[in-house]
């Protein structure tokens, strides 16, 4: 495939045009009075959204050089979304401002490498200033404020606040589509996983088609159980205690299963067999997690335990177990709390060192199952389009709340960036083009507030200069069009979101400024034209 190459100013200007087109499409959504963007989808109806990253992902430009710039800006949005789950529009607007200021300085003869060093130094100083001023976010009301600002909806804020309070910071909050108009919260406490009973004969409540075991014992087995001889000694001892039993194994089959079914039908004693979820190492790890939660010991050859020799001491217990055809929920496992805490700590360490997003996500799920319950927010709306838009806002609100619980919050509305920029007033003691890089960042940090005010119909530059004279924690409330304290009315952003936006924007700006050439595929000529050429060259 032949390539086309653009050099110097021509390449950088094309990249800037691409960044601008993407940022201009996204920035209309910024702030409480921001607008929506309608996306034409290849399948299904159009999508209405005010989520920066959703818009960015849809944008492909016709001009290949400009498209490179748009993809770089898209990178800022997706990277910020991956790290913090929100703040993608802020990051894109910052990147646009830094690229614009930087290219102006390059045109005036600045050295791109020195500019880059200045940008990096300024970014580090701003991030440190934000970290130093961040306030921890604790309690339902604070979380609800963060979620309300993110979703622009108090009812969503309250729902997310309640969900976080009920399942804890590490708890799973899953978001599903509801078939009703209402958006509501469901909590399942304890450990839930997606495997149900092996046979419907285990059902104890035929109306609801579920098996409920109260004050139950739990047998965890790493391999298949097919011989009843292996299981009999243990079953006899359990039958004497009169307590119901949950058997969780790779599989329960053959005569072992038929004997258990006969026992269940005759009501000799209550028993339910369930296949262990997942495969391989994930299944092994999950069984070990359950062992910690329930106080059981996993029966496996590698720990020298055989089913035929196991006594009641290997069993775990729980206050209540509910098994349906698809799910099993274990409530109030009776394992020692210290074991559960140690197990959770171990998973947290694994999350820190993991470099695979998929692994991290699965580890987070395991941690959530251990640490808290599972909250399900069921999203309802009148139309499919509204449902998707609402679901997207709730996802952002949950991500923002988790980010805030992790690292704390800073005043929102673009104000903390203006105040943090005051740290750069002495150019950080740098000189020459490095100092220019610092000043460039100081100017760019005004962009989010400028557009929040502009989208509210105000004069952006006037609002920025007024906020500059205020103290930390004060700024412009675009919802009420007033200046004053932002923390009291709950206009706060997660530190993680704000810091990621600044760092990712600076990273892309440095790349664009140090670009000296851009290489793209040459568009192929029409087939008819191609047919007339090229035949005389083969000798």
UniProtKB/Swiss-Prot annotation:
PROSITE patterns referenced in this protein's UniProt entry, alphabetically: CHAPERONINS_CPN60
One cellular-component annotation, GO: cytoplasm
EC number: 5.6.1.7
Pfam families: Cpn60_TCP1 (PF00118)
Name assigned to this protein: Chaperonin GroEL 2
Function: Together with its co-chaperonin GroES, plays an essential role in assisting protein folding. The GroEL-GroES system forms a nano-cage that allows encapsulation of the non-native substrate proteins and provides a physical environment optimized to promote and accelerate protein folding.
Catalytic activity: ATP + H2O + a folded polypeptide = ADP + phosphate + an unfolded polypeptide
GO molecular function, one term: unfolded protein binding
Region (Disordered): 519-539
